Amino acid sequence: MAEAPTELPPVDGTPLREPGDEWIIEILREIKEEALKHFDPRLLIALGKYIYTRHGDTLEGARELIKVLQRALFTHFRAGCGHSRIGQTRGGNPLSAIPTPRNMQ
């Protein structure tokens, strides 16, 4: 199997490209849409607020939220989500161990 060629810096000396802002935002929209099908919206709002207070409105915050939601969905599916063909027949909410903030019911 041939190795993929390494990316070289552009001739004009600009840095190597990163995934575009639009790509990260699109991935976040998709994973958030999927998470809303499986988790309590209040929990997702609390998670979003927590990450926003840590990272603000930055791409780093978006990446962190993507990472947490991916892990939560993976764990949920492996435990046996009722909507999924992965894992067993039923699964619990892996985020239920996170305490609900006092001002949320």
Swiss-Prot record:
Gene3D superfamilies: 6.10.210.10, VpR/VpX protein, C-terminal domain
Gene Ontology, cellular component aspect: host cell; host cell nucleus; virion component
Main location: virion
GO BP, one annotated term: symbiont-mediated arrest of host cell cycle during G2/M transition
Chain positions found as Phosphoserine: S84
Pfam families assigned: VPR
Keywords: Activator, AIDS, Cell cycle, Host G2/M cell cycle arrest by virus, Host nucleus, Host-virus interaction, Modulation of host cell cycle by virus, Phosphoprotein, Transcription, Transcription regulation, Viral penetration into host nucleus, Virion, Virus entry into host cell
InterPro entries in alphabetical order: RetroV_VpR/X (IPR000012)
Signal peptide (from-to): none
Official protein name in the record: Protein Vpr
Naturally occurring in which organism (per UniProt): Human immunodeficiency virus type 2 subtype A (isolate ROD) (HIV-2)
